[in-house]
Curated annotation (Swiss-Prot):
It comes from the Eukaryota. GO terms for molecular function: metal ion binding; RNA lariat debranching enzyme activity. This is Lariat debranching enzyme. It comes from Gallus gallus. Keywords: Hydrolase, Iron, Manganese, Metal-binding, mRNA processing, Nucleus, Zinc. InterPro entries: Calcineurin-like_PHP_ApaH (IPR004843), DBR1_C (IPR007708), Dbr1_N (IPR041816), Metallo-depent_PP-like (IPR029052). GO terms for cellular component: nucleus. Residues 484-504 have a biased composition (Basic and acidic residues). Active in presence of diverse metals including Fe(2+), Zn(2+), Mn(2+). Also activated by Ca(2+). Binds two metal cations in two adjacent alpha and beta metal-binding pockets. A divalent metal cation 2 binds at residues 39, 84, 174, 226. The keyword Nucleus applies. It is found in: Nucleus. The gene is DBR1.
Amino acid sequence: MKVAVAGCCHGALDKMYETLELLQRRHNVRPDLLLCCGDFQAVRNEADLRCMAVPAKYRHMQTFYRYYSGEKKAPVLTVFIGGNHEASNHLQELPYGGWVAPNIYYLGYAGVVRFRGVRIGGISGIFKSHDYRKGHFECPPYNQQTIRSAYHVRNIEVFKLKQLKHPMDIFMSHDWPQSIYHYGNKKQLLKMKSFFRQEVESNTLGSPAASELLQHLKPNYWFSAHLHVKFAAFMQHETKSKEELPKATKFLALDKCLPHRDFLQIIDIEHDPTAGDSLEYDAEWIAVLKATNSLINVTQSSWSVPENNGLHAKWDYSATEEAIKEVLEELNHNLKIPCNFTLTTTCYDPSKPQKNMEPVHTINPQTTEFCAQFGLTDINDRIQQVKEEGSVRGEYEEEEEEMDSSGSAEEPSEYNTDNSGLSSINPDEIMLDDEGGDEDLSTCSVDPSPDHPPEFSASFSDIRIMPDSMAVSSDDAMDSTNEELEKSGVNKQVEEKSLNERPLKRVGGSENGNSGIKIKRRNQAIYAAEDEDEAK
């Protein structure tokens, strides 16, 4: 089946789907599934905007609210993970995943689903060592610290994913797995993003937690975004025994949805032709959720991963065949995810703006139903209970006084440093087109009006469609990468032909003749190697 993979969407759903429509018009190719690798920005109203960790002047409603209200429907099944620029209050309603709009599914803090027999997993957020061992304690209304820590990856999600034993076809993370850049065209990467050099050379760029998952899960494909550059790599995994078959992962990171950027890729994935067209639960993942339910932590207290070190009575929470069979029996062998989307808040109305709308902590009926179905704890309900007891608020106020400018109190971590990439702690960081050169800073972006869609022929360039074997090297890929591709049976001639085609890019254009976004960061050089939360 054909799968479209997108980088950072930043709320530009109309433009994303318009691009897919163009793909069908020009090449008669219609993707069966769209995967989005974070910074999706499922913003429903003004309150959601206030829960997004971007400077206030860059909070734009974009177009998701039209899909939430039912005014529009996603033309293709869309599955996404969260990034570091999200309406955190909205996604927090669905810790185990769920529908954010008809035909648009969020994987949750971490999740695994199946579509046409293809197993798809993902983990939301970005890695920050100082929050990694904490529980999910945050809830709206957020402050300057929790609006950021809310999207930081927690070790409990990584632990759950590491209990999986069955093969993974596709996995998504927002930030890159640490060290993945050593398996692709590093020279070309540093040519495009020279300010990555220090962290690449010190091997500190990316997420160590994602790297840990990559080594454990060994998926066929791994897709990421976040660093706003297209990059491909091919990683051959080590085998632990002679009997174990060698595995390899094709990694692809994509850019953000902007003119002249490589933000979308089409690939062919082998699937089960007898499987239905519905999104399905993964029985092993549900069994792992049930097994680890007692480990839930909704406080700021550090949680240590159970290990076989004599300190834990139990350390293996993987799903037995009996547990998986039990899940199947509970569902009567019908794994189809119910289409039970419901509105949980008012939707943005351009004619009646509510600029002072405050976010509230909401219990989503989808999560309630999911937890009741499988005997799980609703994390948000637990947070509400603790809040009512007064313990969370008291602990939080004490902790708040100790917090430093990094956004969280420092605590020991499994990892020594914050290895999440290049960015800025500057509160005025510009997250739009950060590589516009010396452009006129007065230039601003004008999104095409939804009521007046642009002419596709004038607004988009040629579209690149990947061959059956996904090309994993860039235009001047390293010889070593090409050698690995040959060893893995990839048709090099087909790949080279595809690589010479123009990649899929959205070209700016509007009725008034303005070009696409060309906004440059103030003091860009100063921001090149700071904290990551605001940069991507």
